[in-house]
Amino acid sequence: MGREEQEMDKLQYVMDLMHKHFGCSTNSDDYATESILLFRDELDVNLLPDFFDEIYTEKEVLVQYFAVEEYIAYIITDVEDQKWRILGVIEGPKLVYYQKFD
């Protein structure tokens, strides 16, 4: 699967989740997306589940952001294999939903 297909899979997954849990749009045009490579110490620990340090120990992470309405969803993946680790949803200054991937 190519990188563009992986990005579309992420967007579709996030759109479905946001619609199901928060009643958000399922139109991809309503979502702003961005990918960024960050060092772990650049992540805001207040916007991560408490157990994040237990499941992820790499120095760098790839974060894909999806903004829709008043929410920002993110997927944190491994840099090398792009395996999904955590999905979180932020509303204002707090984490309102998260999902762990094995």
Predicted regions and their residues:
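Short acidic DE-rich linear segments
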Residues: 2-3, 96-102
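N-terminal trafficking/processing presequences and adjacent post-cleavage segments
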Residues: 1-42
